[in-house]
A protein has these predicted regions:
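Adenosine-phosphate binding glycine-rich loop
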Residues: 125, 129-173
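Conserved Rossmann-fold cofactor-binding substructure of NAD(P)-dependent oxidoreductases
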Residues: 60-78, 85-89
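Rossmann-fold NAD(P)-binding glycine/threonine-rich loop
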Residues: 109-131
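C-terminal catalytic/substrate-binding lobe primarily of soluble NAD(P)-dependent oxidoreductases
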Residues: 153-408
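Conserved glycine-rich Rossmann-like NAD(P)H-binding loop of the short-chain dehydrogenase/reductase
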Residues: 27-41
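Rossmann-fold cofactor-recognition segment
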Residues: 49-65
């Protein structure tokens, strides 16, 4: 039997949500399966899913077993991989199996070293095999990546020019954190992994022949709280800006710099004013700093941080939300002397909290782009959501109930 989508790591916190969503929305249109190490856990999950999923195939797949990975990749259009925590020591064999079989791959990682290593090792091979490898396909980094892409695309269509700058801002967000995400980030901070230096380079995920721009920080010129002239709001650094900014800059490079060759890109979280911005920045810095030192790290793990597999309550996920707003500034003035601006928004509407329920939706719709609308996607390579999918992803997310639009 062949499958359109195989959900790998289906019994994890976000994997379960993805299976629920796939059963309710996409399962009737595509043959899909759930995969993982423990068939007993998979069977228990299947019993908890809606009636439409009662006949879904279960596959025993261990990410450490090369033959099992190759076997499932050979009979699948796209593997949707949630077997991370962290991805950098579990997902590369999955990417390799997909590339060797011409199978597409989707995940929700925000691990810059892993994404850089994946691109270095497999981009050329994936292009040759016509395998589309898509990382960071959840809240990290679809909203910012697609908002920037929509704004830059509209700038060219409306005003015939590239952008001098794009600023993304998380205008509103509410949700919780799962243990898997926290421990994945902890691994990036505390372990010596390949390409860790890419986290410190604003252009660390660009292709080898990429053209560096003016950015020196994830906020563009600074990571400190600041009044942003484009957003016309106070911004502080976003915890997700490290992978998200590098994803957007990689999108621009992969597409041939349609956003602008000298583009300045940055992002942040909207705050009421400078005081709240500094307090938020200091709190974030304290938390990150505490994770570096063994005694405080042990205390946080013991009494504060959730374990892998744990996450927000169902109520918190249902009530969660987010809005991301991109403002693009044209590279030159028009005949009237005015420099044009374009505003694009990504709104979760009723998709749920950003990190989990909405991430499940976005990652499944990304996988369905590859499974059901492959002809509208990029041919292959280690891509980004914007560079690999573009308008097809915008269309699917809008059809799924989110709202992605460019303001008139």
């Amino acid at each position: 039997m062949t499958f359109g989508v195989v959900v790998l790591g289906a019994t994890g916190f976000t994997g379960r949500l993805a299976c629920e969503y796939l059963a309710n929305r996409g399962g009737s249109k595509v043959a899909w399966a759930m995969a993982g190490r423990d068939l007993g856990k998979l069977e228990a999950l299947r019993k908890d899913l809606p009636e439409a999923a009662k006949e879904v195939t279960l596959l025993k797949v261990d990410v450490k077993n090369e033959e099992e990975l190759k076997d499932v990749a050979k009979k699948t259009k796209v593997i949707l991989n949630f077997a991370g925590t962290p991805y950098f020591d579990k997902a590369l064999p999955v990417v390799e199996a997909c590339v060797s079989s011409g199978c597409c791959y989707v995940d929700i990682t925000g691990e810059v070293p892993f994404m850089k290593t994946s691109a270095d090792r497999y981009d050329a091979k994936a292009r040759e095999a016509k395998a589309l490898i898509l990382h960071s396909c959840g809240f990290d980094s679809i909203p910012c990546d697609m908002a920037a892409w929509m704004a830059a695309t509209a700038m060219r269509e409306r005003h015939g020019m590239a952008c001098a700058a794009i600023r993304n801002a998380v205008m509103d967000a509410a949700g919780g954190a799962s243990g898997g995400t926290i421990y994945s980030g902890l691994g990036m901070l505390t372990q010596d992994v390949e390409n860790k230096a890419a986290m410190m380079d604003p252009y660390g995920m660009d292709p080898p022949d990429g053209q560096r721009g003016p950015d020196t920080a994830d906020g563009g010129t600074t990571d400190l709280p600041r009044w942003d002239e484009l957003q016309e709001k106070w911004l502080m650094i976003s915890p997700l800006s490290n992978p998200s900014c590098r994803t957007v800059r990689r999108s621009n490079a992969l597409l041939g710099y349609p956003y602008g060759q000298g583009l300045s890109y940055g992002e942040g979280i909207v705050v009421p004013g400078p005081v709240s911005g500094w307090l938020g920045t200091m709190a974030l810095g304290f938390m990150v700093g505490s994770l570096y030192f063994p005694p405080t790290r042990w205390a946080l793990k013991r009494w504060v941080l959730p374990e892998p597999g744990q996450g927000p309550s169902r109520k918190a996920m249902e009530e969660g939300r987010f809005t991301v707003r991109a403002v693009a500034l044209g590279e030159k003035a028009k005949s009237d002397g005015q420099i044009p601006k374009v505003v694009a928004k990504v709104d979760s509407v009723n998709a749920g909290d950003p990190g989990y329920k909405a991430t499940a939706l976005m990652s499944v719709e990304t996988a369905l782009c590859c499974a059901l609308e492959r002809g509208r996607c990029a041919e292959g390579g280690v891509m980004t959501p914007a560079a690999g999918l573009g308008q097809v992803l915008v269309d699917r997310l809008n059809a799924a109930g989110m709202k992605l639009e460019v303001e008139p």
